[in-house]
């Protein structure tokens, strides 16, 4: 089946974007609002194709998205050439860049995503392959000169999910993203970077109620700022026992980040700058949990009411 959609929407500027107040929380990148901002208008076209073969248990999905925005709310960046006192408590330092939201036309975005699913009968599993391409054209102003940031993202992935039994379940997955950024007037901001995620999940349950869960992930980043090109493992594990009547009770011991390598790295690419951020995240911890399942809660009263009618 094929489906086509058209959608239109508006986006009003936020209160922060409209306030004519200087924010110096980041002294290198101070910002100020713009009370003259207009709302933007976005037009979207969406195309979807779906094919399934129930007999062979295969499927194929294709999605295409195209978007254009008028009066796009973007950023203008201005270099501070000398120390400037806005007030007794606010001083813009020489070398900083002041950012201000403005309206510009010329924003475009296109995205495609494809998925193929098929069975792996020899190992009682299903295989899903996916791939996609994303393009975005973002206008901006740098020292009153219009800059266009062209961003390209290419991604591929694969997932093998088992369908063996209720006692054995595993999932193996891999995804890779390659990104490239090209700017019209700031070639020093042009950049290529790559990241991938590989994971393995295993769930085992015995007929006597013992359970084991394993979740292992590897994440790698390349092409980021020095110090951000990381390669680390995140390993979570749990063991437990189901007990009581009908195995309604469960006692489980879990450990998060067994190798103490958990990290959080992100990249923000805008029309005026590229920023790499590493945040503090929760490190290794252990957790003991008890769970009791309340099955058919209230069913006795409902059955009695039906019998009396």
Q: Each predicted region: which residue ranges?
A:
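Exposed, low-structure sequence patches enriched in small/polar residues
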Residues: 1-309
């Amino acid at each position: 089946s094929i489906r086509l959609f058209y959608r239109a929407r508006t986006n009003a500027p936020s209160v922060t974007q409209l306030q004519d107040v200087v924010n110096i929380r980041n002294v290198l990148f101070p910002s100020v609002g713009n009370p003259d901002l207009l709302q933007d208008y976005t037009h979207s076209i969406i195309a979807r194709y779906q094919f399934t073969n129930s007999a062979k248990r295969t499927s194929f999905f294709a999605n295409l998205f195209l978007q254009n925005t008028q009066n796009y709310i973007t950023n203008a960046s201005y270099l501070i050439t000398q120390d400037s006192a806005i007030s007794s408590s606010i001083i813009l330092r020489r070398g900083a860049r002041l950012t201000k939201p403005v309206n510009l036309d010329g924003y475009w975005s296109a995205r495609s995503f494809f998925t193929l699913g098929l069975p792996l009968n020899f190992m009682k599993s299903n295989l899903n392959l996916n791939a996609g391409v994303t393009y975005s054209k973002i206008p901006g102003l740098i020292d009153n000169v219009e800059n266009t940031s062209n961003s390209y993202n290419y991604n591929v992935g694969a997932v093998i999910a088992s369908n063996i039994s209720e006692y054995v379940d595993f999932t193996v997955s891999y995804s890779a993203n390659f990104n490239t950024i090209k700017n019209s007037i700031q070639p020093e901001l042009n950049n290529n970077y790559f990241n991938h995620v590989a994971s393995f999940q295993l769930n085992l349950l015995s007929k006597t109620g013992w359970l084991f869960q394993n979740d292992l992930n590897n994440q790698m980043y390349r092409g980021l700022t020095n110090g951000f090109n990381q390669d680390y493992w995140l390993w979570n594990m749990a063991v437990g026992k189901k007990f009581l009547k009908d195995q309604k009770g469960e006692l489980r011991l879990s450990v998060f980040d067994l190798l103490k390598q958990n990290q959080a790295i992100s990249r923000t690419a805008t029309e005026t700058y590229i920023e790499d951020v590493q945040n503090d995240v929760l490190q290794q911890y252990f957790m003991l949990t008890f769970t009791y399942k309340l099955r058919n809660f209230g069913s006795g009263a409902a059955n009695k009411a039906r019998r009396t009618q």
